[in-house]
């Protein structure tokens, strides 16, 4: 796992739902200069199509809830995967494949369990500013990727030292441009 290399200097990950606008959004994301995209699906045919059409994007699978889904996504060539919660079996399978994996956590105990298995990046879900502040305080060496946050709260989350990347869902082109500007002003 080379998570730091995967995330790079980009502080915003784009999360996209699978709908009729998916490929339009992927075009907008590419034009806006983002390259870290999480697709809310585990459909391996979809990932193959996206990876072929957008070879410069780092594509992740979101919503992984079983080891078999994780293995299928890995075999489809996704760059990373995440789950809405934490299951040791999924985390251990990701470790076996040396796969970039971001376990979802809803409690400090889940973050501790993920960290004890070697995962230094977690996705609080749901990500509230108060929960992320608590994780930042209790586990300052764990990097936090707040998920599905409100666009207007990006700067608040990025001001927490443990937050390395924020995840915004289905942004429009204006939000993409504003996100790029906001993250550049913080950096």
Where are these regions (language model features)?
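Short, well-ordered alpha-helical microsegments
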Residues: 22-23, 44-48, 67-70, 87-91, ...
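Strongly charged, low-complexity linkers/loops
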Residues: 133-137
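Glycine-rich phosphate-binding active-site loops on the catalytic face of alpha/beta enzymes
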Residues: 80-90, 123-131, 161-182
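Glycine-enriched alpha-helix->loop->beta-strand junction motifs that scaffold or abut catalytic
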Residues: 32-35, 54-57, 75-81, 96-102, ...
């Amino acid at each position: 796992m080379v998570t730091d290399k995967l995330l790079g200097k980009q502080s915003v990950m784009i999360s996209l739902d699978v709908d009729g606008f998916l490929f339009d959004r992927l075009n907008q994301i590419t034009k806006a200069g983002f390259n870290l995209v999480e697709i809310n699906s585990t459909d391996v045919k979809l990932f193959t199509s996206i990876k072929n059409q957008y070879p410069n994007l780092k594509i992740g699978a979101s919503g992984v809830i079983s080891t078999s889904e994780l293995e299928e996504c890995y075999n489809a060539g996704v760059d990373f995967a995440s789950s809405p919660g934490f299951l040791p079996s999924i985390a251990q399978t990701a470790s076996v494949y040396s796969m970039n994996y971001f376990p979802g956590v809803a409690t400090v105990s889940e973050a501790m369990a993920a960290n004890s298995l070697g995962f230094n990046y977690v996705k609080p879900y749901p990500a509230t500013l108060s929960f992320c502040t608590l994780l930042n305080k209790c586990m300052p060496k764990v990097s936090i990727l707040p998920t599905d946050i409100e666009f207007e709260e990006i700067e608040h989350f990025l001001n927490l030292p443990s937050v390395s990347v924020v995840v915004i869902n289905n942004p429009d082109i204006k939000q993409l441009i504003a996100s790029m500007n906001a993250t550049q002003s913080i950096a």
